[in-house]
């Protein structure tokens, strides 16, 4: 309690200008503020409210003086920003920077245009986008059905499959058998006289016999 009256004359003198303040003086005011706080706590415990109010007024003046010194000092954050410190605005992504540059869209447009100018002969058309004749995209079953229909109509593609080759051989075999069966019939037909030849030969025989009979009659009349 004896130290508190000694602290009051230390803070009563006027404060020096804030422009000429040194770090040692600032540290001195900080130490005095610490002592004032300790004195205020002791007086509160003892119930001396008047002394507490006096020390609180001195503490408030010291704090305001230190705040004025801080405001008078040059702002160091400007130097830290130039050295590469990131501010919240710098850390936030810029929406315009996330968008691709206009040259990107130009390159994409040129690539699409070049793809449309490629002649169709270089790359064969494929996919469901080609709306040509329906026979261009037939599945294997429909192709086999068309080939079978062509086979019935007499248009047999050579080398279609093994079944067509077997059918072709069977067709030749049946033709050969039919030719062999027709040979004996023709031969027997050639050996047998038909009805016209038989009738002609009969008529010739009858004519000859009639002539011979007429000759016999003439001879008897001459006698």
From Swiss-Prot:
Feature: compositional bias, Basic and acidic residues: 214-223
Keyword Transcription belongs to the record: yes
UniProt keyword list: Activator, Transcription, Transcription regulation
UniProt keyword Transcription present: yes
GO molecular function annotation: transcription coactivator activity
Domain of life: Eukaryota
Region (Disordered): 179-223
Gene Ontology CC annotations of this record: nucleus
Tissues where the protein occurs: Predominantly expressed in shoot tips containing the shoot apical meristem (SAM) and flower buds. Also expressed in mature flowers.
GO BP of this protein: cell division; leaf development
Chain's role: Transcription coactivator that plays a role in the regulation of cell expansion in leaf and cotyledons tissues. Component of a network formed by miR396, the GRFs and their interacting factors (GIFs) acting in the regulation of meristem function, at least partially through the control of cell proliferation. GIFs are involved in the positive regulation of cell proliferation of lateral organs in a functionally redundant manner.
Entry similarity comment: Belongs to the SS18 family.
Assembly information from the UniProt record: Interacts with GRF1.
Protein name in the entry: GRF1-interacting factor 3
Organism: Arabidopsis thaliana (Mouse-ear cress)
């Amino acid at each position: 309690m004896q130290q508190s009256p000694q602290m009051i004359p230390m803070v009563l003198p006027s404060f020096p200008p804030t422009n000429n303040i040194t770090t040692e003086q600032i540290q001195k005011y900080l130490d005095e503020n610490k002592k004032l706080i300790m004195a205020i706590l002791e007086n509160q415990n003892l119930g001396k409210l008047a002394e507490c109010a006096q020390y609180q007024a001195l503490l408030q003046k010291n704090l305001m003086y230190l705040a004025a010194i801080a405001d008078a000092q040059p702002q160091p954050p400007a130097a830290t920003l130039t050295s590469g410190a990131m501010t919240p605005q710098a850390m936030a992504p810029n929406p315009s920077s996330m968008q691709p540059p206009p040259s990107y869209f130009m390159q994409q447009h040129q690539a699409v245009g070049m793809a449309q100018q490629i002649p169709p002969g270089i790359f064969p058309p494929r996919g469901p986008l080609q709306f040509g004749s329906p026979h261009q995209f037939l599945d294997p079953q429909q192709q086999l059905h068309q080939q079978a229909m062509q086979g019935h109509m007499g248009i047999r593609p050579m080398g279609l499959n093994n079944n067509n080759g077997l059918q072709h051989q069977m067709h030749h075999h049946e033709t050969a058998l039919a030719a062999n069966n027709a040979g004996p019939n023709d031969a027997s037909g050639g050996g047998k006289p038909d009805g016209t030849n038989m009738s002609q030969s009969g008529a010739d025989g009858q004519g000859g016999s009639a002539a011979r009979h007429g000759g016999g009659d003439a001879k008897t009349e001459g006698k």
